[in-house]
C-alpha cells in the first residue's frame, strides 16, 4: 500500500506519497526534501518528529521509550507509514528537552 505523508516543517508543509515498505525519511529525500538525520538507524534523536495524525511502524528503532512513542514521537529514519500520516519534523529539541 502507499500512503499520503504530510510533513510539517519549519519551512512549511510538504506532502508526498510513501509506500508502506519505505522509511519516511528515505522517501522524503527521494522527493527532494531535506530533513535532519544522523545515524539513520533509529539509534539517536536527530530525525525525531511528532505524529499528529495517522500511525507509523517504527519497530526497527530502539532510541525512543514507550512513553515517548505514546506521546507521538517518531524517528523518521525507521518509520514506515501505516496510514495517511501527518508528522511535525525537527522535534529533537522537544524530545531531548
UniProtKB/Swiss-Prot annotation:
Q: Which residues form the 2Fe-2S ferredoxin-type domain?
A: 3-93
Q: Where in the cell is it found?
A: Plastid, Chloroplast
What keyword terms does UniProt attach to this protein?
2Fe-2S, Chloroplast, Electron transport, Iron, Iron-sulfur, Metal-binding, Plastid, Transport
Please give the GO cellular component terms listed in this UniProt entry: chloroplast; chloroplast stroma
Gene Ontology molecular function, alphabetical: 2 iron, 2 sulfur cluster binding; electron transfer activity; ferrous iron binding
Annotated [2Fe-2S] cluster binding sites: 39, 44, 47, 77
Q: Could you give the cofactor binding note from the entry? A: Binds 1 [2Fe-2S] cluster.
One biological process term from GO is: ferredoxin metabolic process
Co-factor(s): [2Fe-2S] cluster
Residue ranges annotated as transmembrane are none
Say which family it is in: Belongs to the 2Fe2S plant-type ferredoxin family.
Q: What does this protein do?
A: Ferredoxins are iron-sulfur proteins that transfer electrons in a wide variety of metabolic reactions.
Q: What is this protein called?
A: Ferredoxin
Question: What is the species listed in this Swiss-Prot or TrEMBL entry?
Answer: Scopolia japonica
Which lineage? Eukaryota, Viridiplantae, Streptophyta, Embryophyta, Tracheophyta
Amino acid at each position: 500500500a502507499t500512503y499520503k505523508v504530510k510533513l510539517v516543517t519549519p519551512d512549511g508543509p510538504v506532502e508526498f506519497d510513501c509506500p508502506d515498505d519505505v522509511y519516511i525519511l528515505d522517501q522524503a529525500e527521494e522527493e527532494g526534501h531535506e530533513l535532519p538525520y544522523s545515524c539513520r538507524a533509529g539509534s539517536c534523536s536527530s530525525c525525531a518528529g511528532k505524529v499528529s495524525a495517522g500511525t507509523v511502524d517504527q519497530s526497527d528503532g530502539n532510541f525512543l521509550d514507550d512513553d515517548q512513542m505514546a506521546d507521538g514521537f517518531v524517528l523518521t529514519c525507521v518509520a514506515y507509514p501505516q496510514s495517511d500520516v501527518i508528522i511535525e519534523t525537527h522535534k529533537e529539541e522537544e524530545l531531548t528537552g
